[in-house]
């Protein structure tokens, strides 16, 4: 089946969660709800086949896989931005 396809909005959501370390703050920055953020993260984790974020009621932090994926995710967004500029 090959590599999983990634969409820009989902990757942007992941980067926002990683940067803000908060679903609520990421949602505010992206103009959506924490519930929508959670759904998009679950979709991305399913596509990649790994957990990117470790969540507790009071803590959001990157998993080992999430830390590894963060720079490529940022590069993906930057490449998109260059392509449409």
Q: What is each model feature region?
A:
Residues 16-31:
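Short helix-boundary/capping micro-motifs
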Residues 22-23, 41, 55:
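Helix-turn-helix DNA-binding elements, focusing on the entry/boundary residues of the two helices
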Residues 10-17, 69:
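Short alpha-helical "packing" element that flanks the helix-turn-helix/winged-helix DNA-binding module
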Residues 47-48, 69-85:
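Alpha-helical linker/hinge and terminal dimerization helices associated
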Residues 7-10, 34, 66, 73:
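The N-cap/first-turn positions of alpha helices
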Residues 33-43:
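Residues within the DNA-recognition helix of helix-turn-helix
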Residues 28, 46, 67:
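Alpha-helical residues within the helix-turn-helix
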Residues 45-62:
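A short LG(V/I)-centered, amphipathic sequence patch enriched
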């Amino acid at each position: 089946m090959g590599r999983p396809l990634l969409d820009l909005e989902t990757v942007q959501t992941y980067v926002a969660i990683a940067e803000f370390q908060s679903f609520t703050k990421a949602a505010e920055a992206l103009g959506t709800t924490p519930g929508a953020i959670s759904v998009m993260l679950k979709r991305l984790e399913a596509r990649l086949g790994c957990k990117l974020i470790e969540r507790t009621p009071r803590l959001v932090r990157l998993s080992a896989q999430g830390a590894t994926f963060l720079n490529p995710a940022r590069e993906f967004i930057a490449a998109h931005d260059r392509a449409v500029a």
